[in-house]
Structures are given as C-alpha cells and as structure tokens.
Amino acid sequence: MQPHLSHQPCWSLPSPSVREAASMYGTAVAIFLVILVAALQGSEPPESPFPYHIPLDPEGTLELSWNVSYDQEIIHFQLQVQGPRAGVLFGMSDRGEMENADLVMLWTDGDRTYFADAWSDQKGQIHLDTHQDYQLLQAQRVSNSLSLLFKRPFVTCDPKDYVIEDDTVHLVYGILEEPFQSLEAINTSGLHTGLQQVQLLKPEVSTPAMPADVQTMDIRAPDVLIPSTETTYWCYITELPLHFPRHHIIMYEAIVTEGNEALVHHMEVFQCTNESEAFPMFNGPCDSKMKPDRLNYCRHVLAAWALGAKAFYYPEEAGVPLGSSGSSRFLRLEVHYHNPRNIQGRRDSSGIRLHYTASLRPNEAGIMELGLVYTPLMAIPPQETTFVLTGYCTDRCTQMALPKSGIRIFASQLHTHLTGRKVITVLARDGQQREVVNRDNHYSPHFQEIRMLKNAVTVHQGDVLITSCTYNTENRTMATVGGFGILEEMCVNYVHYYPKTELELCKSAVDDGFLQKYFHIVNRFGNEEVCTCPQASVPQQFASVPWNSFNRDMLKALYNYAPISVHCNKTSAVRFPGNWNLQPLPNITSAVEEPDPRCPIRQTRGPAGPFVVITHGGRH
C-alpha cells in the first residue's frame, strides 16, 4: 500500500501504513518524478524563507540553503540536487574529513529510496545512527532536480553527532552515482566527495536603514583567468580618486561573477600604509615572484567576505573612515579561489562593493590588532598536534590608550596562517576572565570573514585582552616561526570597535633575552647544538633545536611564564610612552565558565532504520 502523494506542497502526518513500516525501515524518500511531502511528529516548516545559501560543489550539482531558529535551537536545511542521482550524503566533521563524520544519507537500492541519519567510522564506512536526529520534512521533485527539506537540533548529545556552534563548520558532501543494496555497503572512499566551510549560526542583527546620499564603489580584479590549481590567492592593487574627501563606509557586500559562486571562496580589501605617495600596480597571484614587496604593507583590513556571508552592516552610530589626506589612497583586493576540480578557462571579475556616505556618523569605527607580534621569537615545534601561543593586550596599555568611557567591540576577524586550528580572545578584568570576545574552535585559515558579535563587548581602561591560537604542525619537520610569510605563522584578532582611538595595535611577544636563555639551556643539556652567537638569527637557532620532549616542554614553559615585550602602538606605529619591555604576564586567577550544552528531550521512537516511503513504481 502506497503512502499519500501530492503534487501540491502540504504538511500532514504520515499514513498508518507508513508508521507501521517505520518500525522496520525508518525514513525514506520518493526521488523519481514525484512530489512527496512527509511531516514527522507534527513538524512545521520554517515561517521565514531561507536567508543563507551556498553551493557545495564547484559543478553546481548541490546547493544548500538554511534557516536558523535560535528559540528552538534548530536548523532547517534545504538541499537542492541537480540531475538524476542515485543518492547524496551531507554532513559535518571536525576538520572536513570524510571519516568520523556526522551524516544524513539519501540512497536507493534500485527499487526503493531511503533517507536516514548516519555516521562514518575512521575507515570511511557508513553506519546507521541509533538516534535519528535529522528529521525529514519534505522531499519534492521538480523537473530535473530534487529538493530535500530536513531539520536538526544544534546539540543532540548523541556521541556520533556534531555539535553545531557559532564558529566555522566544515560541511562534507558526496554524490552517489549507482544504487547500493544497503547503507553499510557504502564507503566514502568510493564516492565523489568534497568539503565546504561556512558559519551556520550567524548572529541575528538588525539591518540599519541606508541614508539617502549613500554611494557605492566596486573593488574588483578585472577579467582574471582563474588558475586551474586547487588554491589560488589573487592580489589586485587599485586606488581611490585624487583628493577623495572623507567618507564613512557603512556597509559592504560581495560581488561574485555569475557562474563562479562555487570557486570564489573568500575576499578581503586591505588599505595600504600611508608611508609612500604611490604603490606599484599589480594584478596577479599573491605568491608570484613578480609581486612587489611593498604590497606586504597593505594589510589594514577594510572589508572581508567569505562564502555564505551576507552583506555586512556597521552599527547605525559608527562608520569606517575612507579618504582624506591622512590616509593612503591605495587598496589591495585579495581573492581566494578554491578550484578542487581544476576547472580551466573560467574568467572572473569578483570583488567587494563598498557602500559609503558623506554624512559622517557620530563615531568613527576603528580596527585594532590583538594577539602576537609578527616575530620569529614565537615559534611552534614540528610534529605538534595542539601547540598554543598566547598574546596579550595588557591592562597598562588599555589604561593609557583607551578613553574613560571605554570602547565597544562589535565585530571581529580571526587570523592565522596554515597551521592555525583554533583562535580565541577573552576579556579579563580584575584578574578574572569575564567574557569571550570571539572564538572559533574549528578555525580554518582558508575561511576568514569579519563576523558580527552576538553582543557588543565593552572594554574599559585597565582591562586585559588575551588572544590564544592553537596550531597543528604534524606535517612539518622544522620549527614554524612567526612572521609574514605564508609558511610562517600569525595569531591575530582584528577587532572592529568604536569610538576610534589612537591605539591601533596591542600585542606581545616573549622577551628576547629570556628566549636566548632558553637556547642556552638547550645547549647545556644538548651538547651545544644551538648557536647562541650574535650572528645567528632566531629562525636559524630554532632550526638547530633537537625537538625532544625536554626541549618542547621547556619552550612551552618559557611562553607560559617568561616576561613579555608589549607593543602598545599608535596609528603612527610608534609605541605609547613608557617602558614596555620585560613586562610580567597578566595575573589571571579564573577562567570563563563554559555553559554545558542543553540536550533535547528525546521522543520515544522505534528501532532506527531507513524508512521506506515509496517504491519507484508507485502511482502519483
């Protein structure tokens, strides 16, 4: 007996015969030339449309849309599948691996089509989950595409499920080209699979009204031939018009060339320093030997967009200054192309559109760098899985540089290079950590965007801002030192705040003298392998360290207890007055308490299994 089918969208409980089948099979989907709506447990569709969209694969076969309910702590997903397919998988994993992934599966055995919550083991073998936390709401076939609507709680407390938080999520997908007789017959190693990064839980921020005099400026790299390599960072230098008067940027958004939505991964606009009247023009790969060195001084972030992000609006009371004689006219656009299928011949003119106004807002928004100084004094040994480095914006600096009323941080962009895995900035006051400014426990250096904070953070005089980065150097044989090079490392949080102050950089590094004492200790217990002579550079010294457990532990202890050099810098790159060397680490006696995840109340269900809803031969 067939379940009820309809060519019109509807929301109803499954028929009794389906419920009986559910105890044996679980949930399944009609896929061939029918429209099926199956509502489970009286589920309702999301009232508002899906505001967020991303292509999952470069060919455009899979497109994901989603809608977030913070009240119910549930995400509704809509997955569009183009063309006739034997099935798809979609899910999440810690770093984008297909192994140990939390999955939802749609597959056919050649006769029936099934939908089920599943997971993959460390060998990529797929298994049915004992808790079916992905709930199918609707399946609809239109022309040559299939649309699946399903939902899942943020937190399920199922050990096989991924905890969805407001940091980066590594989405995985796969396309099944042939039937499988059972779910257990599927292994991810034999599928066409891929990875996409996104922030699923975006803060609910109201959209300010645009003023009548708003204007736009497009920063686009013209007619780029996208390289057929997997990863390309493209740099383009442009300039503002001569005598461009002072304006406020109040919003920006991405402009992505049609057809390239799956290839343009993220983009940033940087303002160059004002040290020179002119910067050389350039339009090419950022790692090109032809790229002028001066482009490294174009690193003041004006705008940053990543796949899945919508337009970025500044608070009504603040805007980012653009123009005037006191700032550089030169801007650098950086576009990250992600081309895992090595597609050739694709042209692109993507970029970022700035919305600006001559009606200056009450406050100018500033950008402050927190974290570590770009210096080889801070290093990560090779073969490390979770090595942590921490930079401090000390109470002495905030006391001297911030206004009495404090500042309000409303957005943040975390940044490391290739080995960064986690980043967090915490505000401390009176020796106690008070709140997290921003955190990403699944950070990826290939997915960077300016993110609005759920709640603005007020920083007062005397507060401490602590930024920690966790690195993984398992695949490296030499120490990774801090610096500007892509194979060197950084630990930075660009915080966006108002009102703008003279303080542009508040960072730290270990004291150089204490680092040299570390090298002397290594020599004392290691037969003089590290040169401590004046002509040896710090990178050379780190390259000579034999990385046994003693030397690793000693370096960790050095970074955790040794005095620091604080860079409390003005916009002119000059430090605020005072002696900033040999400063003690801030004395923090308590950490921020982490809330325990709230587990949903589970409804009593029958044995988990793929629930057959319809066979291919059913009438419709």
From Swiss-Prot:
Residues 1-19 are cytoplasmic. CDD domains: DOMON_DOH. Disulfide bonds join C157-C599, C235-C286, C272-C298, C393-C506, C397-C568, C469-C491. GO terms for cellular component: apical part of cell; axon; chromaffin granule lumen; chromaffin granule membrane; dendrite; extracellular space; neuronal cell body; secretory granule lumen. Gene3D superfamilies: 2.60.120.230, Copper type II, ascorbate-dependent monooxygenase, N-terminal domain. Proteolytic cleavage after the membrane-anchor leads to the release of the soluble form. N-glycosylated. Chromaffin granules of the adrenal medulla and synaptic vesicles of the sympathetic nervous system. Its main location: membrane. It is found in: Cytoplasmic vesicle, Secretory vesicle membrane; Cytoplasmic vesicle, Secretory vesicle, Chromaffin granule membrane. Cu(2+) B binds at H415, H417, M490. Its EC number is 1.14.17.1. Its cofactor is Cu(2+). The keyword Glycoprotein applies. The modification Phosphoserine is found at S349. Homotetramer; composed of two disulfide-linked dimers. Belongs to the copper type II ascorbate-dependent monooxygenase family. Catalyzes the hydroxylation of dopamine to noradrenaline (also known as norepinephrine), and is thus vital for regulation of these neurotransmitters. This is Dopamine beta-hydroxylase. It comes from Rattus norvegicus.
